[in-house]
């Protein structure tokens, strides 16, 4: 998609495009690192950009989604509390494992001249439905008012499994109408 300047009706002056919010998908893959490097190079020392760095956690294992129930209501509540505790521990461990790649990306972008105040980070929802990673990326972009999405061409193997063997980038191209996509080789 090529973005062009538009003229305002009242003044006849050109307005600058407002595509200054980017969603950058980050993981531990070399492709993701190349995407971060590309963004750092393109936006080096430029002001006015906001970047949301999103790390996609793998889905919770099926055995952590539900416990099967119990006839005794007290036992049911106990099992429910135990399951929620285990889920929270799993998510905390997954986030801890993902944090180094987010920290590296933030440090690299900051080194390129992007102020820390222009960077935000977030994690995906590990409770998401099967095969909805591209939809979740698009929803994150909408929620964060990002009109540009940046992804590496190849993602981690577990992410490829979630996208039914298709490249995440391919799915975004098919579903990402209205967004500018930067797919970094």
Go through each PLM region and give its residues:
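Redox- and metal-dependent alpha/beta enzyme cores, enriched for Fe-S-associated oxidoreductases
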Residues: 59, 66, 86-110
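A structural signal for isolated positions on well-ordered beta-strands in alpha/beta enzyme cores
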Residues: 23, 50-52, 120, 148, ...
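Gly/Ser-rich helix-loop-strand patches that form or flank binding pockets
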Residues: 1-12, 136-185
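A conditional alpha-helix N-cap/helix-loop micro-motif detector
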Residues: 32, 130-131, 165
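Structural beta-alpha unit
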Residues: 1-12, 17, 96, 104-148
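Short glycine/proline- and acidic residue-enriched helix-loop micro-motifs
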Residues: 81-93, 119-123
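Small/aliphatic-rich secondary-structure junction motif
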Residues: 13-86
